[in-house]
Amino acid sequence: MGFSLEKSLGENIDQKAVLTAADKMVELGLVAAGYEYLNIGDAWCLPSRDDNGKLVEDTTKFPFGLKYLSAALHAKGIKLAITTSVGALTPNGYPGSLDREYIDADTFAQLGVDYISHVACDIPATAGFFTPLRRMNMALRATGRRIFYALTFDHSKIMDRMYYTGYEWDGADLSEYTNGYAIEKWLRSTGVNSFCTKSPDEAFDAHLDDNIIGYTGTQCWLSLGDVTVDCECACALAKKVSACAIKCSPIIINADPAALTEKQVEVLTNKGMIRILKDEESRAPAVLKSDNGTVYTKLLTDREYGVFVINDTDNEASVPFYTFDFGMVYSSELKCDMYDVFTNEKHPVFTDAARIKLPAKGSKLFIMKLV
C-alpha cells in the first residue's frame, strides 16, 4: 500500500515536495494505517547517463541526493519508490533500463531505493518483452538489498508467461517478501490507453474478473481527482479499494496526499477493508455469479470471511448470496453473521441465503463469521 506522486507532480518533483507529501501521509494517519511506499516517479535523474553509463541524480531537484531522501522517509515510516522502464526511455523521457538492468539495479540499491515500478514503455520492436523482466529480476536479487519489484503494464498474456517462467505470486502485504511481485496492470480506467471507448467505471468493472487461482495481482492504480477516474465519491472509491482488498491486491494511490478529502481518508484507512487486504493467509477469493450480481468470498484467519457483493446491473437490485454455493450445509445449523466494514451496519443473521440490496453498479464489503 502506498502513494505515487507521478501524476500529481510529474517532472515537477523535488525534495521539498516529497518530504511535504510524506509529512501529510503521517499527519492523516495513512502511514499508521499501512500506506508505506511513496513513489517519486522517473524525474529524479538527469536526462543523460554519465560516461560510465550510470544514472545521475538531479541535484537541483534533490540537493542532498536520494540516499538522504530515503533515510528521511524511513525516519517517518515510509519507503522510497521510483519508476524505471523496461524499454529505452521512461514515460517522461528519462533513460530507461533496457540492456542496463544490472548497472541500474546496483544504482537503485546504492541510493536506498525500496521499490521499483518497472513500466512497459518505449520498448524497441526487436527487444522482446519478457527477457528484460527476467534480467531486472536477477539484477535486483544480485544487489542483496530488499527491493520490492512491481511490474506495470497492460499485456493480455503476461500472467501466464510470468507463471511459466517461475515468478512468485504473492499477495497481502507483499513487502514482507524479499522477492515479491505485484502485477500492476495499467487498466483502461487509469486513462493510459486512450483508445478505450468504455467509461472508467465500465473498464474497471470489466477487469474485476481478472482472477486466476493462486494469483492475486493488483487490480489497478487508483487515481484520485483525475479526470479519467472519478473517485471523489466515497462510494466509488470504496468499491475500488474493496475489489483490491478481496483479491489481496496492493493499493497504490496516484495522488498527492494533501489533495485527499476527509471522506477519502476515511475509506482508505478503514480498518475492516485493510484487515481483509492484508490478511496473512492471502487467499484468492471464490467467485459466485448470479443473474444480477457477483459475490466474492474469501477465507480469512481467525475463522472469518471477507465478502464482497457487487450489483452488476444498471438498476437498483438485490444480489443473492446463497450459503450452499459458499460451502455451507443447511443441516449444519450454522448461521452467517456479518457487518458492512464501511458503515459498521450489522446484516441480519441468516442461514440459507441473504439478499443484499444495492444501487446500480453499487457494492458492499463485509466481514463475516459463522455462529
Predicted regions and their residues:
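Carbohydrate-binding surface patches
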Residues: 238, 244-247, 252, 289-330
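Solvent-exposed beta-hairpin/edge-strand motifs
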Residues: 325-343
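Aromatic-lined carbohydrate-recognition surfaces of secreted/lumenal glycan-active proteins
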Residues: 78-95, 141-159
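Aromatic-lined carbohydrate-binding/catalytic grooves of carbohydrate-active enzymes
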Residues: 17-126
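Glycan-recognition surfaces
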Residues: 100-103, 142, 146-256
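Structural recognition of the beta-strand scaffold that forms the well-ordered cores
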Residues: 1-5, 34-40, 79-83, 114-119, ...
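Catalytic cores of secreted or luminal carbohydrate-active enzymes
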Residues: 238-285
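C-terminal beta-strand-rich structural cap/linker in extracellular carbohydrate-active enzymes
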Residues: 349-371
